A protein has these predicted regions:
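A structural signal for multi-pass alpha-helical bundles of membrane permease subunits
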Residues: 4-298
Length: 298
């Protein structure tokens, strides 16, 4: 038995080894290096000095750090809510076959396969405050133009809208798979018992979707905290995050401190704090899985 087990390991190991090596090179080693840099004053070159917790203390005393964290939290909450709601709504309309349903699914999913850089550039031109398409249309019908990406109160909302538009199709496909896995006889039995559509949704659909819903929310939360590309592209590259820091999420603040200000040690400390926040939220979600997720609906 032991000999057979060793043979299986020898058979599987060559296939797992490349992936394991890549994981170590591109994930484990960078994380370890970032944690190490967080305790130094490294600013490039070969000179560095161990500073203990100074970078972390500086971060917790920094107004920019907490503002970035607040902007990140706002972005994350809105994108999670709207992506899940819109994705679930579209899935409920499209999971049953009807004439042309595959066309509608494809149209709604296409934005997700586009490059976020291309999407960001396109919408930056569309919402350009001076000569953008949207403002041109508003002026043509006698309405006042909006600042959009140049407005402190509107810039983040535009970026949230673009994020939701590009990504809700992915969640839709995820929910369609979950809906199709629910036993249709449960709905038939519920109808016989006199249950209406709303009661069926809360008694069968939502519990049956809870494993997929839990996974979708977890992924959406992690993506929300990690956002960088839309901010970088749509607000002015390395000098972006404006206006007045209204779109400067924590990941973008980390980028600026590292690659614009060359404060690699401090940026690493911010990155470690962000990693701890994401891990903590994920652990809380996983801990609550027993309460929120139902595996009884088949």
């Amino acid at each position: 038995m032991k000999h057979t087990h060793i043979q299986k390991i020898k058979l599987i190991a060559p296939f797992l080894l490349p992936g394991f090596i890549a994981f170590c090179i591109f994930t484990v080693i960078p994380i370890v290096l970032a944690i190490g840099l967080a305790f130094t004053n490294y600013s490039g070159g070969i000179a560095w000095k161990f500073v203990g917790l100074r970078n972390f203390i500086t971060a917790f005393r920094s107004e920019a750090f907490f503002k970035g964290l607040a902007v990140t939290a706002r972005y994350m909450i809105y994108t999670v809510v709207f992506q899940i709601i819109i994705g679930l709504g579209c899935a409920l309309m499209l999971y049953r076959p009807f004439r042309g349903f595959t066309v509608f699914r494809s149209i709604l999913y296409i934005p997700n396969i586009l490059s976020s850089v291309a999407v960001g550039l396109a919408f930056m031109l569309i919402f350009e405050p001076t000569n953008g398409i949207v403002n041109s249309l508003l002026v043509s019908v006698g309405m006042m133009p909006s600042k959009f990406l140049a407005g402190e109160s509107t810039a983040l909302s535009v970026i949230i809208g673009v994020t939701v538009w590009q990504n809700f199709g992915w969640y839709m496909i995820l929910f369609i798979g979950g809906l199709q896995s629910i036993n249709p006889f449960l709905y038939e039995a519920a109808r016989i018992d006199g249950a209406g559509s709303i009661k069926q949704f809360f008694s069968i659909t939502l519990p049956g979707l809870s494993p997929v819903l839990f996974y979708a929310v977890t992924i959406a939360v992690i993506r929300g905290f990690q956002v960088f590309d839309y901010i970088f592209i749509m607000t002015g590259g390395q000098f972006g995050g404006g206006p007045a820091g209204s779109t400067s999420v924590l990941a973008f603040d980390i980028y600026k401190n590292a690659f614009v200000n060359y404060r690699f040690g401090y940026a690493s400390a911010e990155a470690v704090i962000l990693m701890i926040i994401i891990v903590a939220i994920t652990v809380i979600q996983q801990h609550g899985q027993k309460k929120w997720v139902s595996y009884d609906i088949v």
